[in-house]
Amino acid sequence: MVLIHDAERALDVLIHQPAVDSKRITMIGHSEGTIIAPRVAIDNSTKVKNIIFIGIVAQNLRDILHYQVVYRPAGNATQALDKNHTGLISIQQIAKDPHRYSVLLRFLLPSSVVHTFLRTNNTKVIANFLLNKFANNTIEAGYISIDKQLKPLLIKRYENITAFNLLKCNNLGGCPIWYRSVDTLIPTLSIIGNVSKSTGILILNGENDTQTPVQQAFLLQQRLTDVKHPDHTLITYPNLGHVFYPSSQWETRNGPIQQNVLADLYSWLEAHSGLSHPFVTATTSAIRVKTS
């Protein structure tokens, strides 16, 4: 994978900088970077002192995509939007408040409809598209059936994505060639035992992370325990999302990393890298699981 080679080249350049202490190198990976960081550390065990995983991808890409594309939006529909537990969602309600239904609309609307709505702020374009798309609902007109219509649509979307069609690349945030390159990698969960026992490991994850769910962090923590890695710490943060900003369990909001996360990060680095200017104090509000 090209990004792994790029990271290794960057590490080599960094080590040779006069301002860098080559004996205290820490690899930090966020999201996709958590796939890259341990591989670089394994291949450069004498150079990397610590690894920090932020928003961890522990399993393979298909597991993560299934959570993002099927499990999360279907769960959002069933648990948050279907208030009357009828198994149906009103199309008029969706069109009336598209921001509330934004998690679903990402999967239901083509980009042309989204662009028209953003340009005109006319919710009728949303209602008309959905009414036409789901006109075959024989249970109740004007509604989307979660089990018979929404879930099959999400599964089909997942199957299309995981086909990794190399001929199509319609956006920057996940071209098929990138998906396929990541999909061929052995999951981090299966290689983490190859990290040197002398390498310190910190795992940080928001409990409301909708991109890399917190269960991924628990899986990695358990695996590190199983292989008897002597120095690993897991800290999870209630109500924080993928970028460690307050978020709901269904959608990550963007914003600055919260100060308690930065404080915990610095405190751990101070203890593991000998930082000499402790200008922050670690908080105790996060849920912690530590092994030493």
Where is each model-derived feature located?
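Alpha/beta-hydrolase active-site loop
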Residues: 1-16
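Primarily recognizes the serine-hydrolase "nucleophile elbow" in alpha/beta-hydrolase
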Residues: 13-73
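Accessory cap/linker subdomain of secreted extracellular hydrolases
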Residues: 54-194
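Short, proline-enriched alpha-helix->beta-strand connector loops that line the catalytic pocket
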Residues: 194-201, 230
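Short beta-strand/loop motif that positions the catalytic acidic residue
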Residues: 203-205, 209
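Conserved alpha/beta-hydrolase "acid-adjacent" motif
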Residues: 210-216
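Catalytic histidine neighborhood in serine/cysteine hydrolases
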Residues: 225-246
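Catalytic active-site module of serine/aspartate enzymes centered on a nucleophile-bearing elbow/loop
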Residues: 240-243, 248-292
